[in-house]
């Protein structure tokens, strides 16, 4: 016969609850939460595949849902309408509208990303520094210089300003800095 037969083994949740430590209780409660990324993809899949889902306990971001769905042409009318009038809707109403308006289908692709022409950025930053103007004005200067065929002449005069310090201001990427140096030597 064992003297300790009446001792009940407590699990970690019971131990945290009986200790009355808020941090320990919260840590145990957080074990049951899903990662925000998983919740977001569940929402998008529910909209795309027309599966009902409760939005009450989920962190629902109207912006992220609209941004995600706007990557596909067939979803654009619904997303456009929500951008115009959907800001006042509750999360549940927004989700219900998207469920009704978005055509059913499996949508998977990489998101579109902004691709900047780095050589154009170099010219604009160079004009900004030389004329001490802002980026919008430098873009306008560049357009006017190209129109009057004066840009190559101005760049030839300004290539001495392309130093290592200047290139570090333009980009932190060492490979791009080397490309910019090479480009400046060609002017």
Curated annotation (Swiss-Prot):
<dbReference type="InterPro" id="IPR031868">
    <property type="entry name" value="Phage_clamp_gp62"/>
</dbReference>
<comment type="function">
    <text>Forms the sliding-clamp-loader together with the small subunit. The clamp loader holds the clamp in an open conformation and places it onto the DNA.</text>
</comment>
<dbReference type="GO" id="GO:0003689">
    <property type="term" value="F:DNA clamp loader activity"/>
</dbReference>
<protein>
    <recommendedName>
        <fullName>Sliding-clamp-loader small subunit</fullName>
    </recommendedName>
</protein>
<keyword id="KW-0235">DNA replication</keyword>
<dbReference type="GO" id="GO:0039693">
    <property type="term" value="P:viral DNA genome replication"/>
</dbReference>
<keyword id="KW-0238">DNA-binding</keyword>
<dbReference type="GO" id="GO:0003677">
    <property type="term" value="F:DNA binding"/>
</dbReference>
<comment type="similarity">
    <text>Belongs to the Tevenvirinae sliding-clamp-loader small subunit family.</text>
</comment>
<keyword id="KW-1194">Viral DNA replication</keyword>
<comment type="subunit">
    <text>The sliding-clamp-loader consists of 4 large subunits and 1 small subunit. Interacts with the sliding clamp; this interaction allows the sliding-clamp-loader to open the sliding clamp. Part of the replicase complex that includes the DNA polymerase, the polymerase clamp, the clamp loader complex, the single-stranded DNA binding protein, the primase, the helicase and the helicase assembly factor.</text>
</comment>
<dbReference type="Pfam" id="PF16790">
    <property type="entry name" value="Phage_clamp_A"/>
</dbReference>
<dbReference type="GO" id="GO:0006260">
    <property type="term" value="P:DNA replication"/>
</dbReference>
